[in-house]
Amino acid sequence: MDGDRSKRDSYWSTSPGGSTTKLVSDSERSGKVDTWLLILAFTQWALSIATVIICIVIAARQGYSMERYSMTVEALNTSNKEVKESLTSLIRQEVITRAANIQSSVQTGIPVLLNKNSRDVIRLIEKSCNRQELTQLCDSTIAVHHAEGIAPLEPHSFWRCPAGEPYLSSDPEVSLLPGPSLLSGSTTISGCVRLPSLSIGEAIYAYSSNLITQGCADIGKSYQVLQLGYISLNSDMFPDLNPVVSHTYDINDNRKSCSVVATGTRGYQLCSMPIVDERTDYSSDGIEDLVLDILDLKGRTKSHRYSNSEIDLDHPFSALYPSVGSGIATEGSLIFLGYGGLTTPLQGDTKCRIQGCQQVSQDTCNEALKITWLGGKQVVSVLIQVNDYLSERPRIRVTTIPITQNYLGAEGRLLKLGDQVYIYTRSSGWHSQLQIGVLDVSHPLTISWTPHEALSRPGNEDCNWYNTCPKECISGVYTDAYPLSPDAANVATVTLYANTSRVNPTIMYSNTTNIINMLRIKDVQLEAAYTTTSCITHFGKGYCFHIIEINQKSLNTLQPMLFKTSIPKLCKAES
């Protein structure tokens, strides 16, 4: 072992290069370590002191900043409060000032301006609406119109089929359609309502009737009631007449024999204003005054009265009356049918029938126009033309229908359907059968009458339902018919289905030779008088309004009643 130790010492004493190295003792190495530890500890202490000093400095600075921050925030709060108070004060002052201005304007300024502007607008509208070319524009501001798809029945459009030929069917039998009736009536037990007149225009309808407060005498003082309205559909999808405005004319004016026209948004009514009875009127020269009444949908009314000297008559008349039934509107004119007695008879040959009649000649027919009961005056039909009816003072011209084209002058109606004008006249003379045809209003006036063999009217014994031979008589009753086909061969009407008595009102659909479909209103004993029928279409489906003067027998008075039916038109399949 000593040998090993000697070798180990020799190894540590000599370097590989062969040089000799002196080894450090343990005590020397321990002293150096202590020195370095002391230096390190001092350094740490110095750093700690520096850190503490730095922290103190930073803390001091932060305290100063916080104090300045607090002072700044407090200053901002104070400034904000001052600004807020200033703004609030400013806003309060502005609001109070503006509120005062607004209050002053609302209470004083605006009403004054509105009144002025309203007056200016009213003056402008009145000035415009007084001009003929702007009348329709002013009227169109009233939003009243028939329901969509409803229009007056036009025969050329209605009497056709997609395939086959149209015809009136007897099956099923016509029946009354449900719905309300708002025709004007009387408020007294003995009041009598007469002479219903209905005109259906493209937008509205006009209806007029005469109310006599005591009994039914024609010369009795009476109210005239004119209604305007539109046609709507009820919950059953059937058409109804819905009045919008109504005007009652003074009983002291005593209007009689009124005819109506509905055109645009106005209703026009032409009446006689007699102060004597009919027979006295025919026995004197000159006619009783006529009056043209105008009513619009706002209820405004205007009337123009005309004396004999203010009317342009083509011949001198002893009596002249509107024909009760509706008239028509053409461009710039209204045309009403009228009738009356000529002071001097016209020369010419009237409509006549000689074949099959004994001891009858053309002279018999000519003389039959001169009615003894009316002072022997020749009774003719006329066209009463109201020209410039939109002007401040319309002009009236009367044109006599040539006696060569007509039967005995009588009450009647005109209808303008499409491009054709249809005429109906009451069968007051010897010709008892339905008188309906096409009127050509150009010069000379001509009428193409459609012969009807099936329809007639009751009359006195000499001129009853079946009479066809000429003789002097004045009888019959007003029961107009509405043309369903262009030639007026197919018609809708209400006839008093009796020989001599005004009884048994019956709705009829007929052609020239046969009554195809009919409905009796009640029974053969029901008393009635005048009837008028007007028809419409709703998207091609045809309906008719029938107005009948019914005698309320328990009260012994007349009151128009409204009935409705569906037109029994079918299409015959082509073979």
From Swiss-Prot:
Spans annotated as Disordered: 1-25
Origin species: Sendai virus (strain Ohita)
Name of this chain's protein: Hemagglutinin-neuraminidase
Lineage: Viruses, Riboviria, Orthornavirae, Negarnaviricota, Haploviricotina
Recorded GO MF terms: exo-alpha-sialidase activity; host cell surface receptor binding
Subunit and interaction comment: Homotetramer; composed of disulfide-linked homodimers. Interacts with F protein trimer.
One GO term (biological process): virion attachment to host cell
InterPro entries, per database record: Hemagglutn-neuramid, Hemagglutn/HN, Sialidase_sf
Glycosylation sites: 77, 499, 511
